[in-house]
């Protein structure tokens, strides 16, 4: 290493620039260290997103971090044209000023790129050093235009306001006009006494990364690499050059090199990291600590009265609660976190006071009795052995972290309340970054390289869709990917390039729940990033960096299930009030309701929170949970680790007495562990049990036991060796055999890897139980709420509708006279379809209809509705959707009459409005159509056929409500099939099932091997089944998989691991016509003597003649007063039994007179 540094990189970008760099912070810092540089500047484009990690990494590597940003600027001199500047923080004042400039750039809104006004630099100039932006700066652009007056004017600004803090930036990277600019800049520097500084505008680390960088930029800009129109703004020379390279490059301008060192010496920013700063919570005359104690004791008293209404029992229980409360309060106050608990208490209490449901807890916070006393959580931690130290460990100082679930509808109101309470400038949400994930980066790189879609799609589909999937993992799990990589040079080139870009930051977004509350302005800690309209501010620092920078994060999460519970209770309590019954309080329901557990044991858990998947239902069937502890266990057991380890089987066998319960193992157990492991039948299932075992067996404090639990999770050999020794010595002190303690230690270590946080499991089990209880006791109201939550997802609505039918609930079509935007329940206990779930009907039209109904009462008919509603808010197509969905059924005799008269009703309403405007309405100001007028308008319109009605419902609702296309065939289909879909079960080997139903979905897919695969979904109104057709079956029957046709399918039924349901591999498939040809013996027609007239015979003959010549004979059953006779029509009248002819015969003779006869 040379004794004296000769150059410092002052201008580098990382991938946080999100437009023009592929460098991560850590590799950048490593490159700086490898080149033996003593300092480096980070100047990402208009953001400080990488500052905290950059600052920390540089200091820990023994180098000086220089913090800055590249910005776009506008000034009157340059008109609408942007120019570039680099802002460097000379000191903490400069850092704060750049923070404010970046925040203002986002907060005022922007079209393409955020920018600052040059005038802002005057107000925020203290402590800021400016590099001129080279050829793209205002001075550089004027130099290249050679306009002397404008050059002088541009320079004058910086000479006045940044006298010795402005440098002319030079770079030699092979970009256009650089050398011409440098020669002009040298003359200007001499003439105006301006210092020069050398930069290399670093965008990547090595020259070989240039192509990857260009692809990154093309992905952002939407070009392909070979597009002649693609802007080429960068060169292969913008890499991290060594000091030696830079010194050679600027050997002719030594002052430009020296000034990099001078600037580095001038810049010194100190960030306060690792400290926490909370806003002051108002506590009156009391200290924060004393106020927390007071509130906690008051809250605990309320809780104890609720938990133990009997005063004698309460006195017995009180000591252990008081003791636990005092322990927790001491720890919270000693660690300096009383304000945190009070802040969370306040916004949760505000939410409850304002009818915004809050979850009972989430994560380890449910283990705190103080949180329970303050009503932050709603689960008694002592009852369920939940540990405070799992949440806040006095032996490992870290911030407490309450994740709070709110009703989806109210979450934003809570954040708004917090902003009003602490000041809008002190509250912000947190940024999160989207990265180029494995599957997407293959697609993006393939597109930019110009590969055909099919080629890229094939490679992308070889990457499993699992969350967190990487290219490296994909190669491990998908052999075909490795084969394609090895055998195809184009595939190899694509993947190699994708590897360079995988994980690179793609975009910025808003963290799902993170909110920070600052004691002062947020911008005292971090800049603010906003959307294009300058709204929805988020910090430039992500959730980890923002906490490291001193701001405390609060997680405001939206949980849809809480919204469902609220909606259900709203419907329920309207009914309870109407019936004079007490309102339902979901927080007060018993946790041992027998009916709820019976429903649970039957696995009827569709729509029950966390318990509705096929895999979970199978686990429930095996476990047969009969107490709340079992539901807690279910949540913890249904994870890959326990399921794959055999732990689940042991748990179930022990519960049902098929395996001996031991604590924890038949060979190695100890009586002291029984109280800890009894709720889980001796299985170590929870992290809290690991901690309690260490405490009871080996004398650990619970704080120390939490550290042991963490160590076991990390599996570091050196740390585990130390812990084994501590565990053994502690056990021996407790009189427990050392060898036995080590055997138990090994078991604990094994299961610690699978252990789940019981606090989280218990809190979420409570939400699961609440939905289970609602489904059990208020099924219609609960299902109406669940369906409301899925109004935008037709597939989900279809599944939930099927569940309603299974439950014996009736779902009626939407009804404009009683319906609401949401699904609701009428006084007969029927679910009324939500008007908001009708396709093509937005909130505006619904609001207009409901407003008219609220103002004038229910609508008498279509003309009345059109007269009273604001037609400017509802177009014709919306009216048609409402009619075809059934929402207007009570406004006329049938849907066809309503459709036919819609135009007249709209015209009459329009004319009425014009007359009203001219003062020509009748004295009551309403339409003058009489009842007779309306009846006449509706007359002589034949109703729609059942098919037309059902097609309309499917089009507007996504499902069939009034009937089902398959309903008319159910009796017939029973002759072709072995079972209904709802009763279907997997076949034994060699066994075949035959089913029938309506094809509701059908497509052809490709397998990973490139083979065609037919996939269809069959619906017989009792359930649904996925069909798959391979090879010969697909070739032979594939064309029959037409959507909305009825088919009969035979094949092997098995479990589908992907969907969790059943699937059939089809062996044979018939259309309905083919099934009739095979199974139907004859067509029976019943006639009476009154029907047989010359005109009837003529009509009957006209119907049969076009379809005669088939194979199905016709038997006519003639009924007269003297008796019933069978007349077999001649073979020439045998027909093809199509739907069309059967429908026409039914229309002519009546449904009971036409019947298919089977053997």
From Swiss-Prot:
DNA polymerase III contains a core (composed of alpha, epsilon and theta chains) that associates with a tau subunit. This core dimerizes to form the PolIII' complex. PolIII' associates with the gamma complex (composed of gamma, delta, delta', psi and chi chains) and with the beta chain to form the complete DNA polymerase III complex. It catalyses: DNA(n) + a 2'-deoxyribonucleoside 5'-triphosphate = DNA(n+1) + diphosphate. CDD domains: DnaE_OBF, PHP_PolIIIA_DnaE1. The keyword Ribosomal protein does not apply. GO terms for molecular function: 3'-5' exonuclease activity; DNA-directed DNA polymerase activity; nucleic acid binding. Keywords: Cytoplasm, DNA replication, DNA-directed DNA polymerase, Nucleotidyltransferase, Transferase. It is found in: Cytoplasm. Signal peptide: none annotated. It comes from the Bacteria. It is an enzyme of class 2 (transferase). Its EC number is 2.7.7.7. This is DNA polymerase III subunit alpha. DNA polymerase III is a complex, multichain enzyme responsible for most of the replicative synthesis in bacteria. This DNA polymerase also exhibits 3' to 5' exonuclease activity. The alpha chain is the DNA polymerase. It comes from Haemophilus influenzae (strain ATCC 51907 / DSM 11121 / KW20 / Rd). GO terms for cellular component: cytoplasm. Belongs to the DNA polymerase type-C family. DnaE subfamily. One of its GO terms (biological process) is DNA replication.
């Amino acid at each position: 290493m040379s004794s004296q540094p000769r150059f410092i990189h002052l201008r580098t970008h990382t991938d946080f620039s999100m437009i023009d760099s592929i460098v991560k912070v850590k590799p950048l810092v490593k490159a700086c260290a490898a080149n033996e540089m003593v300092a480096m500047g980070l100047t990402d484009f208009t953001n400080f997103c990488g500052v905290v990690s950059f600052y920390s990494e540089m200091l820990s590597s023994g180098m000086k971090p220089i913090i800055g940003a590249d910005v776009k600027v506008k000034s009157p001199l340059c008109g609408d044209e942007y120019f570039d500047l680099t802002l460097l923080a000379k000191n903490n004042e400069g850092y704060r000023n750049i923070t404010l400039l970046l925040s203002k750039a986002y907060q005022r809104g922007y079209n393409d790129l955020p920018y600052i006004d040059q005038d802002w630099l005057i107000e925020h100039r203290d402590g800021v050093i400016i590099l001129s932006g080279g050829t793209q700066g205002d001075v550089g652009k004027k130099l290249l235009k050679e306009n002397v007056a404008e050059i002088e004017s541009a320079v004058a600004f910086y000479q006045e306001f940044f006298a010795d803090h402005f440098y002319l930036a030079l770079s030699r990277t092979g970009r256009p006009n650089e050398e011409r600019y440098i020669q002009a800049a040298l003359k200007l520097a001499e003439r105006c006494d301006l210092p020069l500084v050398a930069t290399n505008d670093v965008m990547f680390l090595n020259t070989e990364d240039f192509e990857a960088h260009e692809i990154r930029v093309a992905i952002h800009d939407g070009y392909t690499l070979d597009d002649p129109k693609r802007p080429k703004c960068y060169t292969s020379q913008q890499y991290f050059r060594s000091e030696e390279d830079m010194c050679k490059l600027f050997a002719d301008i030594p002052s430009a090199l020296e000034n990099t060192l001078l600037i580095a010496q001038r810049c010194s920013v100190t960030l306060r990291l690792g400290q926490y700063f909370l806003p002051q919570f108002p506590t009156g005359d009391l200290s924060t600590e004393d106020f927390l104690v007071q509130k906690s004791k008051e809250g605990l008293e309320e809780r104890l009265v609720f938990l133990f209404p009997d005063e004698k029992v309460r006195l017995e229980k009180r000591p252990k609660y008081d003791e636990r409360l005092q322990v927790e309060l001491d720890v919270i106050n000693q660690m300096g976190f009383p304000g945190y608990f009070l802040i969370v208490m306040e916004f949760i209490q505000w939410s409850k006071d304002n009818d915004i449901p809050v979850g009972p807890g989430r994560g380890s916070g449910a283990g705190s009795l103080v949180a329970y006393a303050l009503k932050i959580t709603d689960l008694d931690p002592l009852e369920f052995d939940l540990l405070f130290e799992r949440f806040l460990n006095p032996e490992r100082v870290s911030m407490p972290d309450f994740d709070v679930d709110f009703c989806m509808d109210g979450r934003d109101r809570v954040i708004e309340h917090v902003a009003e309470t602490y000041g809008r400038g002190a509250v912000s949400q947190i940024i999160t970054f989207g990265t180029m994930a494995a599957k997407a980066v293959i697609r993006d790189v393939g597109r930019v390289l110009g590969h055909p879609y099919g080629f890229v799609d094939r490679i992308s589909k070889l990457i499993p869709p699992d969350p967190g999937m990487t290219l490296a993992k994909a190669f491990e799990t998908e052999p075909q990917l490795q084969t394609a990589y090895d055998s195809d040079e184009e595939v190899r080139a694509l993947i190699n390039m994708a590897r360079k870009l995988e994980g690179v930051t793609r975009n910025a977004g808003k963290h799902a729940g993170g909110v920070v509350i600052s004691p002062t302005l947020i911008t005292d800690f971090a800049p603010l990033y906003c959307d294009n309209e300058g709204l929805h501010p988020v910090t430039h620092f992500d959730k980890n960096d923002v906490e490291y920078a001193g701001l405390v994060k609060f997680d405001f999460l939206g949980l849809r299930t809480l919204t469902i519970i609220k909606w259900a209770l709203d419907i329920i309590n309207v009914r309870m009030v109407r019936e004079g019954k007490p309102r339902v309080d979901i927080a007060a329901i018993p946790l041992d309701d027998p009916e709820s557990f019976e429903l649970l044991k039957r696995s009827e858990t569709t729509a029950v929170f966390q318990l509705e998947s096929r895999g979970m239902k199978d686990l429930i069937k095996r476990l047969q949970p009969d107490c709340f502890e079992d539901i807690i266990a279910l949540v913890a057991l249904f994870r890959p680790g326990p399921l794959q380890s055999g732990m689940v089987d042991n748990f179930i066998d022990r519960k049902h007495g098929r395996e001996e319960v031991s604590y924890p193992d038949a060979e190695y157990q100890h009586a002291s562990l029984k109280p800890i492991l009894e709720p889980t039948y001796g299985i170590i299932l929870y992290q809290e049990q690991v901690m309690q075992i260490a405490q009871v067996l080996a004398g650990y404090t619970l704080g120390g036991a939490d550290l042991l639990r963490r160590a076991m999770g990390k599996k570091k050999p050196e740390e585990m060796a130390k812990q084994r020794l501590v565990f053994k010595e502690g056990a021996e002190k407790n009189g427990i055999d050392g060898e036995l303690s080590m055997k138990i230690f090994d078991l604990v270590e094994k299961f610690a890897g699978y252990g789940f946080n019981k606090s989280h499991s218990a809190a979420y089990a409570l939400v699961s139980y609440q939905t289970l209880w609602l489904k059990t006791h208020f099924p219609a109201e609960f299902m109406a709420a669940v369906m409301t939550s899925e109004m935008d997802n037709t597939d989900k609505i279809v599944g939930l509708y099927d569940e309603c039918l299974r439950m014996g609930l009736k779902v009626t079509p939407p009804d404009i006279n009683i319906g609401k935007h949401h699904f609701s329940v009428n006084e007969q206990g029927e679910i009324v379809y939500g008007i908001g779930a009708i396709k093509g009907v937005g909130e505006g039209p619904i609001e207009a209809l409901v407003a008219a109904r609220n103002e004038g009462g229910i609508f008498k008919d279509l003309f009345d509705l059109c007269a009273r509603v604001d037609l400017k808010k509802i177009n014709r197509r919306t009216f048609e959707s409402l009619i075809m969905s059934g929402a207007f059924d009570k406004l006329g005799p049938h849907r066809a009459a309503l459709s036919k008269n819609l135009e007249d009703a709209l015209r009459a309403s329009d004319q009425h409005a014009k007359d009203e405007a001219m003062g020509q309405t009748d004295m009551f100001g309403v339409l003058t159509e009489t009842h007779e007028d309306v009846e006449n308008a509706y007359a002589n319109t034949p109703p729609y056929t059942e098919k037309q009605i059902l097609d309309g419902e499917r089009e507007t609702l996504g499902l069939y409500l009034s009937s089902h296309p398959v309903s008319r065939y159910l009796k017939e289909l029973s002759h072709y099939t072995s079972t209904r879909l709802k009763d279907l079960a997997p076949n034994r080997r060699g066994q075949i099932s035959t089913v029938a139903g309506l094809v509701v979905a059908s497509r052809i897919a490709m397998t990973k091997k490139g083979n065609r695969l037919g996939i269809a979904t069959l619906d017989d109104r009792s359930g649904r089944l996925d069909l798959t057709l391979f090879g010969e079956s697909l070739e032979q029957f594939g064309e029959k998989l037409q959507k909305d046709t009825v088919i009969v399918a035979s094949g092997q039924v098995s479990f589908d691991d992907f969907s969790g349901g059943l699937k059939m591999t089809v062996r044979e498939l018939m259309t309905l016509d083919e099934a009739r040809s095979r199974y139907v013996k004859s067509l029976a027609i019943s006639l009476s003597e009154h029907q047989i007239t010359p005109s009837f015979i003529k009509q009957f003959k006209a119907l049969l003649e076009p379809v005669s010549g088939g194979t199905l004979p016709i038997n006519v059953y003639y009924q007269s007063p003297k008796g019933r006779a069978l007349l077999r029509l001649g073979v020439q009248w045998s027909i093809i039994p199509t739907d069309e002819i059967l429908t026409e015969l039914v229309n002519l003779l009546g449904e009971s007179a036409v019947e298919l006869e089977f053997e």
